[in-house]
């Protein structure tokens, strides 16, 4: 399922159909949030069911918001700069996602490190896509 989302994200050229790309990155962020919250709730059980649901929602919606900011910022940056295949657009989008995480945690340090790390990871992802690196290689039998 995640592989299909990655493929559908790259079907649309960068800088076009921002609403579709933002939807896809929001869904990917939400999936990551659900997975992370499942680990969090199972490894650190909550005292009540309501608290567990609140934790799941908090992690899921935070990750979805980070994905949405990444998708929207990357697409708008590609349109404004008129350079759709530039890894800098992905760095800017990753930085926006890191700043969103910092705003959620009320921490300048988290925002700064999130900007650097998420921006670098996103730029490397774009560079890998441009150079033909495989994120999900097919097994060789």
UniProtKB/Swiss-Prot annotation:
Ranges that cross the membrane: 21-43, 58-80
Pfam families named among the record's database cross-references: Tim17 (PF02466)
Membrane topology: Multi-pass membrane protein
Cell compartments where the protein resides: Mitochondrion inner membrane
Keyword Coiled coil among record annotations: no
Keyword flag Protein biosynthesis: no
Keyword set, alphabetical order: Electron transport, Membrane, Mitochondrion, Mitochondrion inner membrane, Respiratory chain, Transmembrane, Transmembrane helix, Transport
Subunit-structure text: Complex I is composed of 45 different subunits.
Function: Accessory subunit of the mitochondrial membrane respiratory chain NADH dehydrogenase (Complex I), that is believed not to be involved in catalysis. Complex I functions in the transfer of electrons from NADH to the respiratory chain. The immediate electron acceptor for the enzyme is believed to be ubiquinone.
Family: Belongs to the complex I NDUFA11 subunit family.
The protein's name: NADH dehydrogenase [ubiquinone] 1 alpha subcomplex subunit 11
Organism listed in the record: Mus musculus
